[in-house]
Each structure stands twice: as C-alpha cells, then as structure tokens.
C-alpha cells in the first residue's frame, strides 16, 4: 500500500512505508512482534532471504511468519525465478527461503477457495 492509502485508513494505530528492495531490514527493534505477515508480495523481493532474516529478528520467541501467495504476479515487477517456475515450485522455493533464513517448522498449506484464485500459505516458526 502507498502512503496515501495508509494515511486514509483510520483503523491503523501505526504504519510505515519502507522499500525492502533498497533496504531489506525491517525498521523495527528485535523481538517486537508475535507474527509477521507477507501478503502476496514475496515474488517482488530482490533479497528475500535477507528480508526473511530481518523478519526472524523482529519476531519474539515462538513467533511465526505467514506468507500468503497466489499464482498471479506483475511480470514487470516480479523477480525472474518466479516467472520461470511452476506454482508448486514457488511454494517449495519460498519454503526453502524460510529454512535458509533460520525458521523452523516450515509448513505449506493450500487454502484455495473453490472457483477462485489459489491461495497458498507458507509459515515458519522462530524457536528461540
């Protein structure tokens, strides 16, 4: 979301605009969150493992990352590998990103609704 959209959302108590492709570190202190959510945007990260390591750092012990994915992407913005592998391989790729970044208990779930775009959820746990 852009700054204008975030400002217009009066349900938010806090927000920030931060380009993870130019600065892959999340702008929060260590051990801040119980959950980190990446919603249909992992395919646009140019340094995904660095970003995921940063996410691991801002999670508290037993915190979880949740990555929501679908088969759609903007070809002009998505990194090359996501455009050249099958959707099921994208799930495997993101799972390996999480493992390399240091997450445990990495799982992938298919939560696709009937007659709609697929929805895949990949999660990982910060053990300590």
Task: Kindly give the residue locations of the regions a language model identified.
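Class I SAM-dependent methyltransferase SAM/SAH-binding core
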Residues: 1-26
């Amino acid at each position: 979301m852009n700054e204008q959209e975030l400002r217009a959302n009066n349900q938010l108590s806090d927000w920030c605009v931060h380009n993870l492709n130019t600065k892959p570190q999340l702008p929060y202190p260590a051990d801040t969150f119980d959950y980190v959510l990446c919603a249909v945007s992992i395919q646009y990260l140019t340094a995904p493992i660095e970003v995921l390591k940063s996410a691991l750092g801002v999670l508290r012990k037993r915190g979880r990352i949740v990555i929501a994915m679908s088969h759609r992407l903007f070809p002009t913005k998505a990194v090359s590998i996501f455009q050249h592998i099958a959707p099921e391989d994208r799930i495997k790729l993101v799972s390996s990103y999480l493992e390399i970044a240091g997450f445990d208990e990495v799982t992938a779930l298919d939560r696709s609704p009937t007659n709609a775009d697929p929805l895949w959820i990949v999660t990982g746990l910060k053990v300590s």
